[in-house]
């Protein structure tokens, strides 16, 4: 109450500006003690004001004497921090014309001066009497003067004048009055300054504020919100003008949540049973249905037991409950497809956002145990968040029992500690056709044929009788397609046109009929030039083979002759000269060999020889997609004459480059231009005759492999991942056969197109690893920069880069792919990685990695580089895995490789975690933090009781993420069982 009264007082007192008096002669009861010079000038006398109060005044009237210069100096006046001073003077002046015989020197005005100083410097003995040290304020003239008649009638006409001066910076000042021939009386002098008063405005208190140094000055005053009020938007402030008045309000305060305004000067707490949710709300409101606020100042009403409020529900909305289960389920089974229909729940919980989730479980024949359905089961329109009471489920196993739980959920189901209400239905599927073939690979191609291979479907659902292949030219539609059949999982398609791209699909057939066609994949026949080039490359090999055959026959004849003559010539001298051996190089005669562009005397000649110059008018830049070592990378389009427009990636050379930077930039084009393989990034050409200089390559829609895998964690099958690895290995096989060593093979340098085809890229860094000083991936070794985690030990120690060291790097890429882009060696330092490798430690298998693939990784990581497989062997091994998917069923474990020490990414010590947030951060699943907390899993003890159905219910739908979280929960449960105190 006292505070409210104070605020009301401040508000009422804000009507007028405040004046603080520094000196007022009207209040003096003794002599003023001012200094006059000369003594015959100003005279202090006692008098009466208009109210007959006794006052001390000064008067002067030497009008009959010429050359008057009478000074009156006040005592020292302390300015008290004021910057501008006001002086109010009340005085009377005799009219000169009313004085008889007055000389012409009679005046009716006087001058006002001031002098700043930090201390008292003027006394009666040491006063200064000249205009020099003073600053003149003004010449003061009377508005009215009095005459002899007025004087006789005691009618004094009093003048009041106010003058201001400033800015002042010293501690105080003196005032001086100069008379130079007037007959006047200085009745009173009041010296004061102005300030803006304390005020309450917009629920904020503003303190007393002095005016500025100038009459036009505006002084900012920051306001303070009254109790239980808060600022809105910008900081609240007012401006104090030169007249001591408030103006230009900026910002405001309002009563905070739980408080409402009272008389515009106070914020009162909302009473029990009411609430105010935000500052913006006008006043308190009654609690909505199924909620209450037992105490005052409630910003929100809490829901009663069994009722909840969704995160997106405003506080004004009533609390609601969870729905009951769906009703009256109807199922329709068609081979391996099912249609489920049901009626909505009887109770919706008071909400209209009811949706449905389908939980699929595959069971044993006796239904005593069930497990989560495979990831390839398809739900139409979707599995989670269904808005209609119908779903179509396909790609189920044939002759298999299933249980489907249909959950009813609404916006508050995640708030309930209990699982959603559901209804279950048990179903057994019928005989079905095989599933789709996952992928196809090109074995070889001629001008008029293509040879393809593929693995059998993951769900054959019986014995595969044969395969049907559908193909057509890409420029046509599938209505013009042709068909071919094969008894095996390979086929040669003949009768094709040279240089054409064909779209191919394949499907398997069992006694139940044909399965669905596989996804569309594109393959191209050779052009006439390709065929002749291949023939030219193979001709020397054929000739060499024929020559070798002739030599072999001649050798046999010669040996027989020598043997027949051996006895006759046994006594002849034995030749003592040794045969001379000459090395002719590793490549077979006629094989295309990579040429280092830096062996050219003029590197620009290599660009002209290996890269096609493109007119810049054929190139259209669209958007920035990244930044490279030399400049920005763009997505664009290329339209060459006579060819269709295609999307391309455009690397540019930034402005201000040196000639060396230009050569280094274009060297990558000189390297890429020598390669022609479906798993090597294709160079379209270069632009060197205009600015900026550009390297134009094919556009890869899915970007770098490592980030692509992380974005799609758990969404690819093992056979799809093996298909990606096979493509990378095929590209590296091609490079190794050309005697090209990549040196920087890693998932970040593999690009992925829209068909999941992987292509080796980034040939610019392979020569200049030592020049990179910024990327932490590349660590110093022997004066250079090396990507330690991907590099073979001999390359780290001795900079010995070979195709065998690329094989080591390929093993790391395999590990990256099977772990969906996880960082090799995790958070180990580069030096720890080097030490571990030297001690023969190797990476363990990623989660759910087939044992055959991990064994291939270990083969690639043999310490003896000569013991590592060649890329041709790796391609053959992967092809066998693709043809026989059963070989990938066995999952690798650390204990399965006793002869090889493996690094063990230590399981986090769950006893060190105190919150669910800490645990999710440790296992890199922090994106699900809100889902866990919203669903009520707020402690680690509750988390250890979670199942796969719980994860699905809270929104963890990716299989890879589910496995990772469930594996961590299992480890946590084991640790907690071993340390019971953790559960406390």
From Swiss-Prot:
GO cellular component, one term: endoplasmic reticulum
Keywords: ATP-binding, Cell adhesion, Cell membrane, Cell projection, Endosome, Glycoprotein, Kinase, Membrane, Neurogenesis, Nucleotide-binding, Phosphoprotein, Receptor, Repeat, Signal, Transferase, Transmembrane, Transmembrane helix, Tyrosine-protein kinase, Ubl conjugation
Post-translational modification: Phosphorylated. Autophosphorylation is stimulated by the ligand EFNB1. Required for interaction with SH2 domain-containing interactors, for activation of the MAPK/ERK and JUN signaling cascades and for ubiquitination by CBL.
Residue span, SAM domain: 911-975
Spans within the Cytoplasmic topological domain: 564-984
Signal peptide region: 1-17
Subunit architecture: Heterotetramer upon binding of the ligand. The heterotetramer is composed of an ephrin dimer and a receptor dimer. Oligomerization is probably required to induce biological responses. Interacts with EPHB6; transphosphorylates EPHB6 to form an active signaling complex. Interacts with PICK1. Interacts (through Tyr-594) with NCK1 (via SH2 domain); activates the JUN cascade to regulate cell adhesion. The ligand-activated form interacts (through Tyr-928) with GRB7 and GRB10 (via SH2 domains). The ligand-activated form interacts (residues within the catalytic domain) with GRB2 (via SH2 domain).
Its biological purpose: Receptor tyrosine kinase which binds promiscuously transmembrane ephrin-B family ligands residing on adjacent cells, leading to contact-dependent bidirectional signaling into neighboring cells. The signaling pathway downstream of the receptor is referred to as forward signaling while the signaling pathway downstream of the ephrin ligand is referred to as reverse signaling. Cognate/functional ephrin ligands for this receptor include EFNB1, EFNB2 and EFNB3.
Name recorded for this polypeptide: Ephrin type-B receptor 1
């Amino acid at each position: 109450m006292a505070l409210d009264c104070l605020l009301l007082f401040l508000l009422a007192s804000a009507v007028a500006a405040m004046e603080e008096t520094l000196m007022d002669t009207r209040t003096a009861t003794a002599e003023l003690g001012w200094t006059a010079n000369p003594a015959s000038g100003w005279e202090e006398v006692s008098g009466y004001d208009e109210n007959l109060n006794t006052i001390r005044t000064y008067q002067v009237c030497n009008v009959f004497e010429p050359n008057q210069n009478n000074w009156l100096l006040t005592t020292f006046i302390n300015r008290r921090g004021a910057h501008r001073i006001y002086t109010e003077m009340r005085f009377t002046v005799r009219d000169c014309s009313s004085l008889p015989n007055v000389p012409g020197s009679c005046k009716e005005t006087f001058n006002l001066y001031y002098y700043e100083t930090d201390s008292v410097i003027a006394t009666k003995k040491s006063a200064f009497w000249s205009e020099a040290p003073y600053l003149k304020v003004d010449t003061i003239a009377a508005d009215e003067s009095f005459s002899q008649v007025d004087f006789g009638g005691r009618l004094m006409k009093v003048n009041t004048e106010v003058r201001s001066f400033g800015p002042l910076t010293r501690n105080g000042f003196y005032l001086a009055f100069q008379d130079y021939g007037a007959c006047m009386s200085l009745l009173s002098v009041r010296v004061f300054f102005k300030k803006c008063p304390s005020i309450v405005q917009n629920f904020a208190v503003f303190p007393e504020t002095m005016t500025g140094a100038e009459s036009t000055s505006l002084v900012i005053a920051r306001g303070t919100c009254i109790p239980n009020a808060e600022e809105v938007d910008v900081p609240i402030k007012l401006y104090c003008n030169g007249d001591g008045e408030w103006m230009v309000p900026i910002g405001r305060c309002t009563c905070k949540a739980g408080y409402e305004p009272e008389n515009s000067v106070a914020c009162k707490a909302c009473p029990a049973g009411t609430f105010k949710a935000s500052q913006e709300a006008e006043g308190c409101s009654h609690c909505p249905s199924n909620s209450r606020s037992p105490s005052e100042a409630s910003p929100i009403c809490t829901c009663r037991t069994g009722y909840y409020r969704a995160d997106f529900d405003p506080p004004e909305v009533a609390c609601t409950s969870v729905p009951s289960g769906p009703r009256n389920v109807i199922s329709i089974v068609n081979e391996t497809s099912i249609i489920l229909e049901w009626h909505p729940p009887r109770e919706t919980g008071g909400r209209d956002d009811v949706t449905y989730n389908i939980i699929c479980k595959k069971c044993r024949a006796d239904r005593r145990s069930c497990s989560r359905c495979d990831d390839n089961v398809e739900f139409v329109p979707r599995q989670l968040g269904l808005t209609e009471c119908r779903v179509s489920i396909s790609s189920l196993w044939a002759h298999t029992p299933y249980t489907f739980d249909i959950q009813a959920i609404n916006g508050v189901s995640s708030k309930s500690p209990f699982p959603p209400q559901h209804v279950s239905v048990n179903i057994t599927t019928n005989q079905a056709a095989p599933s789709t073939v996952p992928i196809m690979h090109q074995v070889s191609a001629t001008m008029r044929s293509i040879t393809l291979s593929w693995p059998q479907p993951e769900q054959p659902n019986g014995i595969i009788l044969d395969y049907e292949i559908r193909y057509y030219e890409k420029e046509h539609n599938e209505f013009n397609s042709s068909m071919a059949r094969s008894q095996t999982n390979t086929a040669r398609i003949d009768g094709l046109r040279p240089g054409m791209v064909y779209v191919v699909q394949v499907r398997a057939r069992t006694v139940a009929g044909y399965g669905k066609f596989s996804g569309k994949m594109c393959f191209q026949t050779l052009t006439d030039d390709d065929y002749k080039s291949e023939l030219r490359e193979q001709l020397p090999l054929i000739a060499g083979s024929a020559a070798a055959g002739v030599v072999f026959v001649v050798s046999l004849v010669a040996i027989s002759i020598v043997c027949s003559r051996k006895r006759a010539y046994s006594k002849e001298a034995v030749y003592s000269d040794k045969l001379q051996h000459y090395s002719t190089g590793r490549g077979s005669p006629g094989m295309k060999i990579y040429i280092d562009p830096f062996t050219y005397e003029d590197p620009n000649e290599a660009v002209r020889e290996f890269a096609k110059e493109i007119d810049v008018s054929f190139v259209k830049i669209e958007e920035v997609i990244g930044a490279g070592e030399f400049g920005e990378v763009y997505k664009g389009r290329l339209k060459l004459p006579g060819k269709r427009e295609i999307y391309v990636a455009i690397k540019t050379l930034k402005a201000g480059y040196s000639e060396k930077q230009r050569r280094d930039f274009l060297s990558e084009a000189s390297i890429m231009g020598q390669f022609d393989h479906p798993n090597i990034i294709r160079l379209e050409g270069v632009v060197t005759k205009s600015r900026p200089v550009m390297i134009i390559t094919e556009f890869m829609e899915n970007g770098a492999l490592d980030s692509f895998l992380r974005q799609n964690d758990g969404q690819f099958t093992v056979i799809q991942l093996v298909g990606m690895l096979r493509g990378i290995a095929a590209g590296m096989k091609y490079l190794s056969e050309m005697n090209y060593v990549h040196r920087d093979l890693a998932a970040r340098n593999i690009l992925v197109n829209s068909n999941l085809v992987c292509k080796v890229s980034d040939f610019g860094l392979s020569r200049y690893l030592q020049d990179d000083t910024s990327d932490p991936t590349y660590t110093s070794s022997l004066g250079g920069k090396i990507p330690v985690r991907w590099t073979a030990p001999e390359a780290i120690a001795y900079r010995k880069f070979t195709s065998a060291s690329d094989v080591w790097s390929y093993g790391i890429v395999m590990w990256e792919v099977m772990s969906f882009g996880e960082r090799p060696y995790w958070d180990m330092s580069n030096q720890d990685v080097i030490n571990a490798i030297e001690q023969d430690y190797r990476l363990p298998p990623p989660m759910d990695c087939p044992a055959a693939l991990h064994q291939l990784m270990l083969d690639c990581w043999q310490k003896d580089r000569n013991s590592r497989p060649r890329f041709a062997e790796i391609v053959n091994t992967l092809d066998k895995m693709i043809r026989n998917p059963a070989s990938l069923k066995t999952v690798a474990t650390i204990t399965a490789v006793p002869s090889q020490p493996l690094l063990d990414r230590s399981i986090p010590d769950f006893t060190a975690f105190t919150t669910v947030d800490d645990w999710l951060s440790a296992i890199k699943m922090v994106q699900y933090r809100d889902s866990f907390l919203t669903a009520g899993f707020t402690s680690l003890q509750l988390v250890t009781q979670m199942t796969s159905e719980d994860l699905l219910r809270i929104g963890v739908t990716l299989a890879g993420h589910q496995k990772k979280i469930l594996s961590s929960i299992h480890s946590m449960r084991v640790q907690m069982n071993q340390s019971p105190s953790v559960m406390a």
